[in-house]
Amino acid sequence: MAGISEPYIEIFEQPRQRGMRFRYKCEGRSAGSIPGEHSTDNNKTFPSIQILNYFGKVKIRTTLVTKNEPYKPHPHDLVGKDCRDGYYEAEFGPERRVLSFQNLGIQCVKKKDLKESISLRISKKINPFNVPEEQLHNIDEYDLNVVRLCFQAFLPDEHGNYTLALPPLISNPIYDNRAPNTAELRICRVNKNCGSVKGGDEIFILCDKVQKDDIEVRFVLDNWEAKGSFSQADVHRQVAIVFRTPPFLRDITEPITVKMQLRRPSDQEVSEPMDFRYLPDEKDPYGNKAKRQRSTLAWQKLIQDCGSAVTERPKAAPIPTVNPEGKLIKKEPNMFSPTLMLPGLGTLTSSSQMYPPCSQMPHQPAQLGPGKQDTLPSCWQQLFSSSPSASSLLSMHPHNSFTAEVPQPGAQGSSSLPAFHDNPLNWPDEKDSSFYRNFGSTNGMGAAMVSAADMQSASSNSIVHATHQASATAASIVNMETNDMNCTSLNFEKYTQVLNVSNHRQQLHQAPAACPPVAAPGSTPFSSQPNLADTAVYNSFLDQEVISDSRLSTNPLQNHQNSLTLTDNQFYDTDGVHTDELYQSFQLDTNILQSYNH
């Protein structure tokens, strides 16, 4: 009839090409169902067809044929519902427009059974494309890992017999997932999905079975394509590949994502792609720049913290004053640079606040009882018998060899000096002791001067006789209170009994005898008293550039007041800041020295 189209078969949904495994009959299990092309785990579909330009009953036959032309009947069998002798056949009514095949499975045969299977197809006249029988027996031409579905439709004739055959239609090839050369390519897992833009990163891929001579790793982005580098030895048991990434086509400043997939060159089959990120070239692979930045930030924060602490630091406390009992109130905190600093004390207006006047007592040669006899120690006898200079006192007697024993004050009119310390003289530590042992002048210039340990070695019990209470005691010759070498305080409180000064630029003059000492029997008198105030020793204290001539008193002794009185007994020096205050702390009573000459 003119204008009426002939009926034909159309595939509504193709079978899935990969992912299905062909089963052997001896496995004793179902071969499964061939899924449709769009089948998912949640929505399973199956291969389906429809017959266009026809409405009525139809008989459908589905067989397996080879992949390549001529399409010969395949030795594998279709198994499932409505299947017999290796093929599927069923009748459908006009109510079904789309015909779906849900229970079709593929069952493979052994190589030794290929001839028998082909003979069965010929006997059942299963040859949709009428391939000559001679070609059908050529067993070596069959590919056992791939098949196609062939759909045939038969329409009923006027007698109701299905004799009118429509042209057969074949599906896409279906590959056995068990065969590596036809299996579905799938990346199961990778150890890393990013790498350097320069390439060369080692990547491990776990995959389904592949053939080591028919596989490659491809990187794709738009029109750019590159392949990973590996050899056949890098394919482990067909399920793992170790390769190195190719470099990207250009340098990048930000990460860029490309597609990575497996591809089989023989059939150009590819796997599902996965993302791979190329990272910019790292100029500092070990993170040294970041570490330096962190260190810089840490230092800046530390400096800021220290700066705030310095600005908030309280001012230095005033120099501790000496109370009438002669004890220091408070130590000066160490907050200065490591240079010798000797700030001055100016709290006492006159030396009378520190020392009571030493009045001259008449000589009373009283008999000493046998129970109270003070003699010079053996060390002093040895010292003054040879008349050594004051600078040799330290080497003969260490600074801790004597104790400052303070005699109790006598009757009214006694000139004994008040005791400043009740305990033996102790240096704060060995550092301060060594400093005063080696310190020779106020500014590091001038002649060598007597050390503090020499002055400390004098004992009040050995100098002053028991009957002469007017003799000055040396309970505390030098006091030091320091936290560090930065701030040092010297106290020449009771060293005045061994000094007789008339002029700080001239040699010491020996004072006339006024109060001769009375020694007990067996004691050694002071035969050479000027040795206690050696000229070189005293000049070393006074002959310095830091002493201001205009501030030091050089007036001669008048009205028999043979004493040189300065306003304070402590001095400090901070690199010339208080040099005009230096050595204003000596109170010298020549009557004491005169008493030793008698």
Curated annotation (Swiss-Prot):
Keyword entries, A-Z: DNA-binding, Nucleus, Phosphoprotein, Proto-oncogene
Region (Disordered): 391-426
Species annotation: Gallus gallus
Official protein name in the record: Proto-oncogene c-Rel
Top-level taxon: Eukaryota
Residues with PTM Phosphoserine: S266
Listed Gene3D superfamilies: Immunoglobulins, Rel homology domain (RHD), DNA-binding domain
Boundaries of every RHD domain copy: 7-296
Gene Ontology cellular-component terms listed: cytoplasm; nucleus
Motif Nuclear localization signal, residue range(s) on this chain: 289-294
One Pfam family per UniProt: RHD_DNA_bind
Disulfide bond annotation, renumbered to this chain: none
Subcellular location(s) per record: Nucleus
Keyword Nucleus included in the entry's annotation: yes
Keyword Nuclease among UniProt keywords: no
Subunit structure, interactors included: Homodimer; component of the NF-kappa-B c-Rel-c-Rel complex. Component of the NF-KAPPA-B p65-c-Rel complex.
Function: Proto-oncogene that may play a role in differentiation and lymphopoiesis. NF-kappa-B is a pleiotropic transcription factor which is present in almost all cell types and is involved in many biological processed such as inflammation, immunity, differentiation, cell growth, tumorigenesis and apoptosis. NF-kappa-B is a homo- or heterodimeric complex formed by the Rel-like domain-containing proteins RELA/p65, RELB, NFKB1/p105, NFKB1/p50, REL and NFKB2/p52.
